[in-house]
Amino acid sequence: MSEISFVTVTALTKYIKRKFDVDPHLEDIWIKGELSNVKIHSRGHIYFTLKDDNARIQSVMFARQNRNLAFTPENGMKVLVRGGISVYEPSGSYQLYAKEIQPDGIGALHLAYEELKKKLSQEGLFDEKYKKPIPAFPSVVGVVTSPTGAAVRDVITTIKRRYPLVKVIVLPTLVQGVNAGESIVSSIEEANRRDLCDVLIVGRGGGSIEELWAFNEEAVARAIFSSDIPIISAVGHETDFTISDFVADLRAATPTGAAELAVPNMLDLLERLKTLEARMTKSMQQDLKKRQERVKNLQSSYAFRYPKRLYAQKEQEFDLIFDRFQKQLAMTVDRKKQKLNEQTYKLEMLHPEEQLKQARKRHEEQTVRLKRNMKVQLKQIHSQFQTVLGKLNALSPLQVMERGYSLTYKENELIKSIEQVHEKDEIRVTLNDGTLTCEVLQKRGETNG
């Protein structure tokens, strides 16, 4: 009987999990169903069961995926869920790891719309204080829309008709379908990153709520709010507003209306210039007439008829001012003289003879102190000198010689050993009181007795 091969539960579960993970059909899949057993964890994770009439699957959506969720999942909602299927090893059950949840059906879309509208309004994304002004005379207008739809043709035609000087840049964008929101966000970010235009039109032609839903996505709303370029929302829906309409700096009911808001009308500008020119001409003529009348009045005035009298009064005023100046100058000189006399008196009070007497007294006192200090210091130096001299004399060879010792030299070299001399050598013996020249008759060391 052959030996049976066993596997552990863990190994089997891991094997099955790998089968799920490598299956391309289960890696990214859309599933339609009804929510039940919805539980929102304190950390933000959402646990729920997705079911239909015949089956159910355990599901989880982690907090990092549900941050942009446009509505709050509740039991009984019909939804479309995108995610991947894998095995939860501890229980050995397969489950759905959700990445995206969308309401299924128009009623659910309206619910999601209202919840997102409330959320963004509370955050302040709709506040007027954040609205950027639309430039009056843009040089470049950017258009975020489908490059093949009627909307882009209407926008370009309207802009060129109204204001031919402007340049139009179209950023080809998906405006309908699953990836439309991501495409709109990408185009807005590209326009800002490259600083492509002065104003941006974001929109499309009309359609159903499902077709316009991309303009109700939170990511699109936040991209519009974060844009440095002013944005005109142009979703072709006369009565209903999209979330993008609330966030945009300006809302137009149609793409054509957005084009009219984005650029001025050249004909209107020309007409306005003509009106301003006529108004300015009339104003200048009126002003010129007033000035001419004023000149006439001046020419007939008293001053022009008697010009000398015009400055006679001024001459008199000048004389009065000059007299006051001279008086003021004399008073100033007198004050300076008085102050000088006071200073002179103070200097005379400080007699130089007294100052010299005090200086001599201080000099004599300092001289006495200096002599006394010098005597003390000389006495100390003499005492130190005698001490050092005594020490030097104690070490001097002359002092040693006074006690009966002598120094013996051979050819000016001091003899320290009998090995330095030989018999018949001439040596010089220095005593305390003189020098002897001697001849060596005999050498005898200590060993010779």
From Swiss-Prot:
Top enzyme class: hydrolase
Gene Ontology CC annotations of this record: cytoplasm; exodeoxyribonuclease VII complex
Gene Ontology BP terms: DNA catabolic process
Annotated compartments: Cytoplasm
Main location per the UniProt record: cytoplasm
Catalysed reaction, written as an equation: Exonucleolytic cleavage in either 5'- to 3'- or 3'- to 5'-direction to yield nucleoside 5'-phosphates
InterPro entries recorded: Exonuc_VII_L, Exonuc_VII_lsu_C, OB-fold_nuc-bd_dom
EC number(s) given by UniProt: 3.1.11.6
Signal sequence range: none
GO molecular-function term, one example from the UniProt record: nucleic acid binding
Keywords: Cytoplasm, Exonuclease, Hydrolase, Nuclease
Domain of life from the UniProt record: Bacteria
A Pfam cross-reference name: Exonuc_VII_L
Assembly description: Heterooligomer composed of large and small subunits.
HAMAP family in alphabetical order: Exonuc_7_L (MF_00378)
Protein family: Belongs to the XseA family.
Annotated function: Bidirectionally degrades single-stranded DNA into large acid-insoluble oligonucleotides, which are then degraded further into small acid-soluble oligonucleotides.
NCBIfam families listed in its UniProt record: xseA (TIGR00237)
Listed name of the protein: Exodeoxyribonuclease 7 large subunit
